[in-house]
Amino acid sequence: MSHERRGRGVVCRGLAASVDLRLLRSAGRERRCDAHPTIRLIQHQQPMKILLSNDDGFQAPGIVALYEALTTLADGKCVAPEHNNSAKSSALTLHSPLYVHQAANGFRYVNGTPADCVHIALTGLLGYRPDLVVSGINNGANMGGDTIYSGTVGAAMEGYLFGIPAIAFSQVDKGWGEIESAAAKAREIVQQLMGNRLVSPAESSDAASWLLNVNIPNMPLDALKPLKLCRLGRRHAAERVIVQDSPRGEKMYWIGGAGAAKDDADGTDFHATAQGHVSMTPLKVDLTDHDNLGYWAQTAARMQAFVAVEGVR
């Protein structure tokens, strides 16, 4: 959006809006941003509240670094899996009980999936509605089709499904190299979004939540190139399954590694991170193939006609 409005420290440019932090400490006045008729910039007296989770487990360096970085900006609570739950997507545990324990550092951990953690937190554990759900920092990239499988994205998506803005942060390469740099970049992004405060009124039935997927190259902070808005790329098919013999003589099967990048053209998350940029992709949950609804409507009509002719009911 090109619309811009300045006044008393407020600049509105759609999602690129920024708010003078002094206004956040002012009395609870609110100013409407004309860039969007349903969005308000809310100026809070109270600190923002952030719920953190991940899929690598509550002891992973990524979530520890992220928590330390974000709690300089807001009140943060961590509810994360007890153990590594990578590639659990948005799975919920429905047929066994879940238990919540608290670690010495105050982190709460659950014997469940990333989505379990966020779901439990939002439906009773916290006792309040956070302003933002943040997941990560993941040990490895979540680009292209990774987002379908990712527990990191799944945790953020659970917050989004509850109408809360959410972000999934991942580091492109495994091993936690430059994790402090990634946490600092994540803090910078969250701070900018906090400045925007792009949320719908609490009483509105159409809460303006959003879901962002962010991938950060493993580089020193001053070497990272600017944030780049991207579409998801695409990988080749996964590598072949790995077959081994167990000590008991049974065949064991290990899921093969993710395929290499296939669609890594300019404009994709793969291309951006390969060039040293931090990639950011807005996601949605609607899996409907809108482009082909017309085709399938015609196909369904022909199928129905065939059924009628054949007399199959």
Which stretches of residues belong to each language-model region?
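A cross-family phosphate/adenosyl-ligand binding-site feature
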Residues: 50, 61-124, 128-129
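Short, glycine-rich nucleotide/cofactor-binding loops
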Residues: 52-59, 146
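Short beta-strand segments
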Residues: 53, 79-81, 111, 135-138, ...
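Internal, conserved structured core segments that host functional sites
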Residues: 120, 128-173
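Electrostatically charged, flexible surface regions
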Residues: 181-313
